[in-house]
Amino acid sequence: VAEQAKPMFELVYFAPGRILISTTPEGNIQAIKADVELSVENKDVVIIQGNPVITAQGFDRLNKLAGVSLVMPSRIDVPGHGNQPNPFFILDPATGAIRFVMAKMVGIGYSPVGNLVIVDQSLLFDLLSYLKMDAIAKIRAVKGCGKVANKSTLSEKEKDWFFIPILDENYGICLDPLHPEFINIIKEHTQRQRFAERIALGILKRNCLRHHPAIGIMNVQLGEGGKCKVPILAWRKDLGMEELRKIAEDKSARAG
């Protein structure tokens, strides 16, 4: 009797669910297909303006199965500064604090059809822009903590307020430094400066994973209990760290 052909995927149960695996003739795992559960409770998903969005933590959970390798090229081209170490920090000349973080990351992994795909992402993390967004949000939410105005319209008292230019040096955000919320705005900004590199690389990591076809998803539909399942098909084709780094450097060099 002829031996029956082995199916492409074999069903395997494990707590708390099940996966499908494909094996080589030698019995080694070649591919894994599974539904990965994400939830709001576990902070894998957050609701932004009414839409569920996968967080960096959620992408980490998906990538444990997808297996996309994230590599930082050693150098990055920075406009006005030439070729610099990656990541690169630009300081505020007036305060010496971090003003920008510029970084590049490369995601290397296999698409659902088994092709090697390289995703190259760059980021300019502008701390002042985040400060402006925080301040405007606070002005909208808390009465009396500040205003958006032209300097020429400010009262004598308001002229002593903290001013952040927006459109030009005369029009911007005015914050009352004696208001309790002012301290919260500055505290948040200080925390971003303190952890600027970590935050920037976290954003880059999420961008690489959401653009890589091994995951390729950002928004999800939540079901009961604020949970959802994301299908992942992961190929197991080992690449050494040196090979990954060479691929990343070559991709970065071609991208400029």
Which positions does each model-derived feature cover?
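Glycine-rich anion-binding surface patch
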Residues: 1-203, 211-256
